[in-house]
Amino acid sequence: MRGTLATALLLVISSRVATESNQLDPQQLSNHVVGTYDKIYTKSSPRRFLRGSRKQRDDLAPTAADENRTINNAIESAMHGITFSGGTTAATRNAAREVVDINAFSKRPRLSLNVPPSETSAHLIEAPTFPQRNSASTSTTSDIATSSSRTSNQRTPKTQASLDMSHKTMTRKSSSKNQFKKSTALKSTKRKVRARKIPAFVVNKVYTLYFDHVKTKSLGFDPTVKETKAMLSLYFESSVDPFYVSAVLSNFFRYFDDKELTIHKKKLGTTLTSALSTLAALELPPGMLKEIERPFVWYASLKRWRVMYCDFFEFVKVNSDKITNSLPNKEFYRGETSDIVRDKLLATLKKETNTNTRYKRKRKLKNDLDDVLKKYNVKEEIGAAIRDLGEQFLKADRQTIPSRRPTRRPGASHIQPSNQRTDLTPHGLQVPGPEKNSYQHIKSKDHARKKRPRSSS
């Protein structure tokens, strides 16, 4: 009789819990359940489904009202079938309480994997594939022992830890794989040929030889070690497309501090010195005066840089053997450069003198001056004086390296002498001898065929 009563109580409570589990609202599901167009499926085991949300576990547990109602129903059913004394009623009440207490803990829900889609299924939001584990269940040792028969097929903590570790490994591999693909895509856009890193002993030796060359010929400009390194780097980079001279100078000039700027101003001739003296007479703030001087020094340095640019490559070509023999590692230099490389470098310099490139330099100088004037908010008359000084520098911008024109017949008297080029640079430096013919081999063959010979008379 008692076995029949216990079986009836278990069937009643199990049926009620199973019914409530199958009637869950999709909006109240935890983040382990994902709603699709035609089904609802769980991403993990039912035990992990209940463990992921404490609120969900509390919703599935019977409330106090359900517990009292179940106990009363069980007692009424037992009273109809039991004819013993009142002591049996107390035993039945205790047995019912024990059954309710057992079912109050986490229980595996019976979710249907093929539930038809409802109106609220579209509002479900997919959660992360592997959410983090929450705190463990609050069941006691006796409760776990009581329900061990129902949880024998669940994952142990050791198994779950190994699964989590394997997931982290897979995630790390997938992320590293994506990073590898991204870096490969970036590498494909970079230049395939890279310039060699020049050791310090090579730079110092080339600088010593080139400085003696400049001093012997009295060219008027004395290069620094940094400038020699920049030109030497550009020389070794000749296997790829060379940079513009102005771009190399801008990148090199960016790292000038105030001390280097003061030393550099002494190498740029009297034109810049008089302009800077005019700026100093305006009584500008010290910070503004330094910022105003920098664009002018850059512009004047570009003219000096062009002359030194061509002369350096001529020096390297002529003194290639001397440079190679003076280095401890003779294999580094690899001998002299071919005429093709030299032509490419000089052709790049020729682009610096075209109309479009000169217009960009003029615009850059004006923009730099305007930025400084706006920053310090100077008076209109001071700003006008600084802009006029900038216009004087722009008018002096002309082709530094003169190209030799075809010789004309004596009868061509309509050409004005003022249009002829001189061999002097804008800052008063004599152009080196080899540079006067720098563009002779770059001229097109069509232009050479149009050259008329002199008359025999």
Swiss-Prot record:
- What would be one Gene Ontology cellular-component term for the protein? extracellular region
| Residue ranges, annotated region (Disordered) | 110-188, 398-457
Glycosylated residues, per the record, are N68
Signal peptide range in chain numbering: 1-19
Q: Show the ranges annotated as biased composition (Low complexity).
A: 135-152
Keywords for this entry? Glycoprotein, Host nucleus, Secreted, Signal, Virulence
Question: Motif RxLR-dEER at which residues?
Answer: 48-69
The annotated regions of Basic residues compositional bias extend over 442-457
Localization recorded for this chain is: Secreted; Host nucleus
What ranges does the record list as Polar residues composition bias?
153-163, 176-187
**Role of this protein:** Secreted effector that completely suppresses the host cell death induced by cell death-inducing proteins.
Comment text on domains: The RxLR-dEER motif acts to carry the protein into the host cell cytoplasm through binding to cell surface phosphatidylinositol-3-phosphate.
Q: Member of which family?
A: Belongs to the RxLR effector family.
Query: What's the protein called, per UniProt?
Result: Secreted RxLR effector protein 8
